[in-house]
């Protein structure tokens, strides 16, 4: 009897000693410092600014210290009791990498998937680590076990996959249907002339540049012919063209001819036109531009234009050569007469082509400009000429431009 009682007494003494030693350690470590900080402070007693304590949240005021925020990457997750807790041995293992915590179900091995009805299989510590990332397949929710730090409990969260990753297949299908319906509606409202306008604009083809010989022509008329209420570029009126480069004091002439035959954009017939010969002995002037009321325009291909001979250095104001563009197409009205009165023109002129009822045939006339009397934006004599451009201070006429400088017949 004495021996058991002595054993019990020794156990009680050991427990008391252990409890008292824990209390002393707690006071030394500073765990009780927040409790002491809540006690009233005597105003008469002086305190130092520095308190040798481990807890940095202790302040010298009567306010309750704010608990420190959670570390980054450890959100507050509510613990659910529906799922079985993993064994306690997992808490002493190091934390798994983030890729193992939230691995998507599509790339996990097949053996890692098991239904929630199957009991957890006993495994080694290494196998138990991989089991913490197991996805329990359910409909429509999925339970994901996340392994946190070594001193935290393993917490199970329930995630609704439908809310996190919405199905975008239906939205994509609706978008494609709406886009297709809009395109069909637009195509239904457009006629053949609108399609011709889209495919034959000057900016798209980039081969032809518009010029005009009428002083009343404006920019949009240089690009399009007005047909009723719709604007369609008049590409069905193609023509042959001759470009002459003539040097003063010489008898040689360089003639470039190019015949162009193209299927009409608005009709199913083919149109071919020829150019009457031009007398180059007489230099035409601006009087060949025609009456102001007539609407005339032409289209000159860049390849047909020649570069003026720059082997001889010229000064501003000297005449060295001219560019003469002569194009002719169709027949004019009875009131209009062509500048070339030769009899060969009447013989070689093709019969009047069939044109739209609200449009008149166009007759193209000659234009001549001196290339060596104009200076470019850098103050040099123009050498390379091209067709196109529009003058800002002059009314648009039959003109050419040198580099960036636009040249017109003259102000009006």
Swiss-Prot record:
Signal sequence, renumbered to the chain: 1-21
Keywords: Signal
Low complexity composition bias: residue spans: 88-105, 250-259, 266-293
Protein source organism: Caenorhabditis elegans
Biased composition range(s): Polar residues: 124-134
Domain ShKT residues, every copy: 371-408
Region (Disordered): 85-134, 250-294, 327-357
Name used for this protein in its record: Uncharacterized protein ZK1290.10
Skewed-composition ranges (Acidic residues): 330-347
Basic and acidic residues bias: start-end ranges: 348-357
PROSITE patterns membership: SHKT
Lineage, broadest ranks: Eukaryota, Metazoa, Ecdysozoa, Nematoda, Chromadorea
């Amino acid at each position: 009897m004495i021996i058991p009682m002595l054993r019990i007494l020794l156990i009680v003494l050991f427990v008391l000693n252990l409890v008292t030693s824990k209390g002393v350690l707690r006071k030394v470590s500073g765990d009780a410092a927040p409790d002491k900080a809540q006690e009233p402070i005597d105003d008469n007693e002086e305190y130092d600014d520095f308190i040798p304590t481990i807890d940095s949240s202790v302040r010298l005021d009567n306010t309750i210290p704010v608990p420190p925020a959670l570390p980054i990457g450890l959100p507050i997750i509510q613990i659910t009791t529906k799922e079985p807790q993993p064994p306690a041995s997992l808490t002493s293992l190091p934390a798994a990498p983030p890729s193992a915590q939230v691995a998507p179900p599509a790339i996990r091995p097949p053996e890692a998937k098991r239904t929630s009805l199957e009991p957890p299989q006993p495994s080694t510590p290494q196998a138990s680590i991989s089991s913490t990332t197991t996805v329990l397949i359910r409909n429509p929710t999925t339970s994901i076990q996340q392994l946190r730090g070594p001193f935290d409990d393993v917490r199970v969260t329930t995630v609704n996959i439908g809310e996190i990753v919405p199905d975008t297949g239906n939205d994509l299908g609706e978008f494609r249907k709406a886009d297709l319906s809009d395109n069909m509606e637009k195509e239904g409202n457009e006629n053949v002339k609108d399609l011709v306008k889209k495919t034959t604009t000057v900016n798209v083809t980039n081969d032809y540049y518009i010029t005009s010989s009428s002083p009343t022509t404006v920019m949009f008329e240089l690009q399009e012919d007005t047909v009723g209420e719709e604007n369609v570029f008049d590409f069905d009126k193609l023509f042959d063209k001759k470009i002459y480069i003539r040097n003063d004091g010489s008898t040689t002439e360089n003639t470039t001819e190019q015949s162009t035959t193209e299927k009409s954009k608005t009709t199913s017939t083919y149109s071919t036109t020829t150019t009457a010969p031009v007398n180059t002995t007489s230099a035409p002037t601006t009087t060949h531009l025609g009456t102001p009321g007539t609407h005339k325009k032409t289209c000159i291909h860049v390849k047909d234009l020649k570069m003026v001979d720059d082997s001889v250095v010229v000064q501003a104001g000297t005449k060295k050569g001219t560019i003469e563009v002569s194009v002719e197409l169709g027949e004019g009205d009875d009131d209009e007469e062509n500048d070339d009165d030769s009899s060969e023109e009447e013989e070689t002129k093709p019969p009047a082509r069939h044109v739209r009822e609200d449009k008149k045939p166009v007759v193209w006339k000659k234009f001549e400009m001196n290339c060596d009397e104009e200076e470019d934006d850098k103050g040099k004599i123009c050498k390379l000429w091209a067709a196109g451009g529009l003058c800002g201070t002059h009314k648009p006429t039959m003109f050419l431009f040198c580099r960036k400088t636009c040249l017109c017949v003259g102000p009006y």
